[in-house]
Amino acid sequence: MKSVILASIAAMFATSAMAADVVVSEPSAPTAAPVDTFSWTGGYIGINAGYAGGKFKHPFSSFDKEDNEQVSGSLDVTAGGFVGGVQAGYNWQLDNGVVLGAETDFQGSSVTGSISAGASGLEGKAETKVEWFGTVRARLGYTATERLMVYGTGGLAYGKVKSAFNLGDDASALHTWSDKTKAGWTLGAGAEYAINNNWTLKSEYLYTDLGKRNLVDVDNSFLESKVNFHTVRVGLNYKF
């Protein structure tokens, strides 16, 4: 009987010791989901399309030998057409949300303006067309939200401008054509939105001035060309 009691006590102590060795694991804390951060820093390439228009001015003066008087005025040609092209650039985003960037683009253009019959006292026709143009610009932006940037932009503009004039009669005539690359400046603003970490959409406005040049400057006659226009376009960029 005594041996049975001793065996029972020994078994009870053994069970207690085993229970003390059992480790109960605590449930692990939930892991926080990674924060989806976006940075504008990096290079990109893209495409764009839009519409451009403006008023091309052509101041002129021609001496009318029959009436013995100087005929002067300006042919203000309303121009417009579609534009489309490609762009590439690089952005640097600062800690305060400011984004510094540089961008270049090249555009095909159908922007054309013409006028005919009895313009400013001269009979005939005048036509000017921007065949293509491009820009090299700086961009200064600010992140209104993590994925939305608004910016201003400006820099160098250049383009090929073709002009043809056949104005006046034999006594006071301006007949000429020109097909030259012109340089000027551009200034504008836009907004760009990151769809995801690689693709962005933008809308942009640019004012472009391709400068002034003499088309005719002989004797008592001259004809100048002043080409400037407004561009509104949308674009799609792929960010590296």
Curated annotation (Swiss-Prot):
Keyword Lyase: no
GO terms under biological process: monoatomic ion transport
Sample GO molecular function, one term: porin activity
One Gene Ontology cellular component annotation held by this UniProt entry: pore complex
Signal peptide: 1-19
Predominant location: membrane
Keywords for the protein's UniProt record, in alphabetical order: Cell outer membrane, Ion transport, Membrane, Porin, Signal, Transmembrane, Transmembrane beta strand, Transport
InterPro entries: OMP-like, OMP/PagP_b-brl, OMP_b-brl
Regions crossing the membrane: none
Compartments (UniProt record): Cell outer membrane
Region Epitope recognized by the monoclonal antibody A59/10F09/G10, annotated ranges: 48-83
Pfam family name, one: OMP_b-brl
Subunit-level organization: Oligomeric.
Similarity-based family: Belongs to the Omp25/RopB family.
Role of this protein: Major outer membrane protein associated with peptidoglycans. May function as a porin.
Protein's recorded name: 31 kDa outer-membrane immunogenic protein
Encoding gene per record: omp31
